[in-house]
From Swiss-Prot:
Residues 98-126 are annotated as: Disordered. The keyword Nucleotide-binding does not apply. SUPFAM superfamilies: S13-like H2TH domain (SSF46946). Located at the top of the head of the 30S subunit, it contacts several helices of the 16S rRNA. In the 70S ribosome it contacts the 23S rRNA (bridge B1a) and protein L5 of the 50S subunit (bridge B1b), connecting the 2 subunits; these bridges are implicated in subunit movement. Contacts the tRNAs in the A and P-sites. Part of the 30S ribosomal subunit. Forms a loose heterodimer with protein S19. Forms two bridges to the 50S subunit in the 70S ribosome. GO terms for biological process: translation. GO terms for cellular component: cytosol; small ribosomal subunit. NCBIfam families: uS13_bact (TIGR03631). Residues 108-126 have a biased composition (Basic residues). It comes from Bacteroides fragilis (strain ATCC 25285 / DSM 2151 / CCUG 4856 / JCM 11019 / LMG 10263 / NCTC 9343 / Onslow / VPI 2553 / EN-2). This is Small ribosomal subunit protein uS13.
């Protein structure tokens, strides 16, 4: 039986601490805190969780963490706000360049996309 938390099926054969990181917005440290608060051993595999343990974890995540769609929409709204107020970071987002001060002379290919090749000028014939 697959355990579903906030719309994500957790992998059955992984430890609980790792399996919870499949949820967007929960990393290793957050998953360890959640499992401690729920009283579940973090080395216990997901398939060995009881229904009560899964329900307790669901309850903790729902009450204390912003995850999946809510978190994604909040991040998008934050980026949109930066773009609307026209600050430097918003402008960098709008034109698709690195936002955190990285150099763009040579690299930054992830943000800029594939190279746009420029044709050479033809030599003028006399």
């Amino acid at each position: 039986m697959a355990i579903r938390i906030v719309g994500v099926d957790l992998p059955q054969n992984k430890r609980g601490e790792i399996a919870l990181t499949y949820v967007y917005g929960i990393g290793r440290s957050s998953s360890a805190k959640i499992l401690d608060k729920a009283g579940v051993d973090k080395d216990l595999k997901v398939k060995d969780w009881t229904d009560d343990q899964a329900a307790k974890i669901r309850e903790i995540i729902g009450a204390e963490y912003k995850v999946e769609g809510d978190l994604r929409s909040e991040v998008q709204l934050n980026i949109k706000r930066l773009m609307d107020i026209g600050c430097y970071r918003g402008v960098r987002h709008r034109i698709g360049l690195p936002v955190r001060g990285q150099s763009t002379k040579n690299n930054a290919r992830t943000r800029k996309g594939r190279k746009k090749t420029v044709a050479n000028k033809k030599k003028a014939t006399k």
